[in-house]
């Protein structure tokens, strides 16, 4: 049996641009694509933390080091500059591979620069990591 598993996640990235008239896709900084093991043209799900919108599109490579997260095409009606998003890619694999597979989880700072790379989808970085406090849910930070 094939299983669809979490393969890659870029957590709480800030949308930097939206272009309604582009042909579609999401533009992602090449550094983030590498960190998350995403390929150009790979299917990604975008989850907008601010408004709850979820959509499926494909990744295109943005300028390395730019921090770009650009929403292109019709998705720009749903996701806007300044919104926090989670970018997710899934992989289909045989059960034995799925049980051993470790996804790539990338936490970013307010400028979409990686601050933590890991494999545990339930992990949240601690406060010692530069910029990590901004990544946490404000309800948790207030405790």
UniProtKB/Swiss-Prot annotation:
Give the Gene3D superfamilies listed for this entry. Answer: 2.40.40.20
- Quickly give the catalysed reaction: L-aspartate + H(+) = beta-alanine + CO2
Look up keyword Cytoplasm and say if it applies.
yes
On this chain, the residues bearing Pyruvic acid (Ser) are 25
Pathway linked to the protein: Cofactor biosynthesis; (R)-pantothenate biosynthesis; beta-alanine from L-aspartate: step 1/1
A cellular component term (GO) from this record? cytosol
The protein's required cofactors: pyruvate
For whether the record's keyword set contains Lyase, the answer is yes
Alphabetical list of InterPro entries matching this protein? Asp_de-COase-like_dom_sf, Asp_decarbox
Q: Where is it mostly found? A: cytoplasm
- Active site (catalytic residues): 25 (schiff-base intermediate with substrate), 58 (proton donor)
Recorded GO MF terms: aspartate 1-decarboxylase activity
Any Pfam family the entry gives: Asp_decarbox
- Record family assignment: Belongs to the PanD family.
Self-association state and partner proteins as the record states: Heterooctamer of four alpha and four beta subunits.
What protein does this entry describe? Answer: Aspartate 1-decarboxylase
- Give the species this sequence originates from: Mycolicibacterium paratuberculosis (strain ATCC BAA-968 / K-10)
Q: Which gene encodes it?
A: panD
